[in-house]
């Protein structure tokens, strides 16, 4: 696959992962694969320890066999995405382009920019960013997927 140049990921509403113009969400291994991919997307600024991924995917009371399930899941993610994009064994890092667009992050940024503009009395400047936040926030987060960290 090589290095990716652009990615657009939609976590609110219908789950979409468009990387370099190709939809890759169907290459992810089932619901659990989508949950893990989404978690890694939102935490891509740093490597994520395997124990943290276990908690994210299965919760505090995860049975011992989930360690093997996590290894299998990560192997399938590497196969679908390309091993060069999912780095590490004890700490896992998803490598996405710096310009990656994630709708949930755009909503948070829009809300922050709107609040800052309002605080400075620039009401008109708040309109666009507030609209982005509103339109993303009206869609459910990770529709149809379940994990301890999804609320």
Language model segments and positions:
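Short acidic, hydrophobic short linear motifs in intrinsically disordered regions
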Residues: 47-56
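C-terminal flanking helix
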Residues: 71-74, 78-82
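Residue-level signal for inorganic ion chemistry
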Residues: 53, 77, 133
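Long, low-complexity, charged/polar intrinsically disordered regions in eukaryotic proteins
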Residues: 2-10
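A structural micro-motif at secondary-structure boundaries
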Residues: 12-34
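A short, compositionally biased
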Residues: 9-15, 80-81
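Intrinsically disordered, charged and Pro/Gly-enriched terminal/linker segments
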Residues: 1-3, 25-31, 39-45, 58-68, ...
């Amino acid at each position: 696959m090589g290095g990716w140049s652009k990615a657009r990921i939609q976590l609110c509403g219908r789950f979409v992962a468009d990387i370099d113009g190709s939809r890759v969400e169907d290459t992810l291994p089932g619901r659990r694969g989508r949950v893990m991919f989404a978690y890694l997307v939102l935490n891509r600024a740093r490597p994520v320890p395997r124990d943290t991924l276990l908690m994210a995917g299965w919760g505090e009371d995860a049975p011992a066999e989930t360690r093997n399930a996590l290894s299998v899941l990560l192997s399938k993610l590497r196969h679908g995405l390309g091993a060069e994009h999912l780095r590490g064994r004890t700490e896992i890092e998803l490598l996405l382009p710096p310009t990656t667009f994630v709708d949930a992050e755009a909503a948070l940024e829009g809300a922050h920019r709107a609040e800052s503009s309002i605080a400075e009395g620039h009401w008109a400047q708040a309109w666009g960013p507030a609209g982005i936040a509103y339109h993303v926030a009206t869609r459910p987060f990770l529709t149809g997927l379940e994990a301890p960290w999804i609320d």
